[in-house]
């Protein structure tokens, strides 16, 4: 059983607090689903001393250039010497942490000329890049993946009708094909305590990590 702290989109005062160690002492892993400053992630890592995996969203992308070449500016190159904040960048990658298999996709649906935005087709291409590794996991570990970390939600699950906050159909295909236990996303801000944060879709529990959210990997319930 693992306890995972998920964060996204806003600096949560319950996390960014002198009491963070007391509140989250039993957390095994941290997932950051985008739109957060890296110094906030650095605070979480340095105080909890737990592995933290992250992706960029469509905001707070100033340091994205250190991790990848931006599609619209060939002069900005991936920086191999950048030390970062100690977190592990997961976008368009697959990682194994202990017995947990994770993958991530950053960014949002393309709605203007800003960085880290994708068309539906471009997101399918990002997924295709990971298929060989996913198939290898199925052969070696008996499953493709445990947790998919995204910024945007899947189409029709927790998303909105405006172009920026529309979810990706590609994630529905990913869940149907590779059956992760969890898909953790951000991007959709929650201002009402009654708004839905967790939805079961086929074999996957889809979770909105806005602010912060805790996952227990044994019972697939969070709070």
Write out the residue ranges for each language-model feature:
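Binuclear metal-dependent phosphoesterase catalytic core
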Residues: 1, 18, 94-98, 174-178, ...
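N-terminal active-site segment of His-dependent metallophosphoesterases
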Residues: 1-47, 61, 136, 140-144
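Active-site neighborhood of phospho(di)ester-bond hydrolases with catalytic His/Asp-centered motifs
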Residues: 6-8, 29-35, 53-58, 90, ...
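Conserved catalytic scaffold of divalent metal-dependent phosphoesterases
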Residues: 6-15, 56, 60-61, 68-166
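Active-site environment of divalent metal-dependent phosphoester hydrolases
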Residues: 11-15, 37-42, 58-65, 110-115, ...
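Short amphipathic alpha-helical segments and helix-helix/interface helices
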Residues: 20-21, 41-45, 168-175, 195-196
């Amino acid at each position: 059983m693992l306890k995972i702290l998920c964060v996204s989109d806003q600096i949560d005062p319950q996390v960014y607090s002198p009491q963070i160690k007391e509140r989250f002492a039993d957390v095994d892993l941290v997932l950051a689903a985008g739109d957060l400053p890296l110094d906030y992630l650095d605070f979480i890592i340095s105080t909890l001393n737990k592995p933290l995996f992250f992706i960029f969203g469509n905001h707070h992308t100033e340091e994205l250039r250190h991790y990848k070449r931006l599609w619209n500016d060939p002069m900005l190159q991936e920086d191999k010497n950048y030390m970062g904040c100690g977190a592990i960048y997961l976008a368009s990658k697959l990682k194994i942490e202990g017995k947990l298999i994770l993958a991530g996709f950053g960014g949002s649906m393309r709605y203007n000329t800003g960085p880290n935005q994708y068309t539906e087709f471009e997101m399918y291409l990002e997924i295709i890049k990971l298929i060989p590794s996913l198939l290898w996991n199925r052969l070696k570990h008996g499953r493709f993946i445990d947790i998919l970390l995204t910024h945007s939600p899947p189409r029709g699950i927790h998303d909105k009708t405006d172009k920026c906050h529309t979810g990706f159909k590609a994630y529905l295909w990913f869940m149907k094909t590779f059956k992760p236990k969890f898909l953790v996303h951000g991007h959709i801000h929650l201002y009402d305590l009654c708004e839905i944060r967790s939805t079961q879709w086929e074999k996957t529990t889809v979770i909105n990590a806005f602010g912060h959210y805790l996952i227990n990997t044994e019972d697939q319930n969070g709070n």
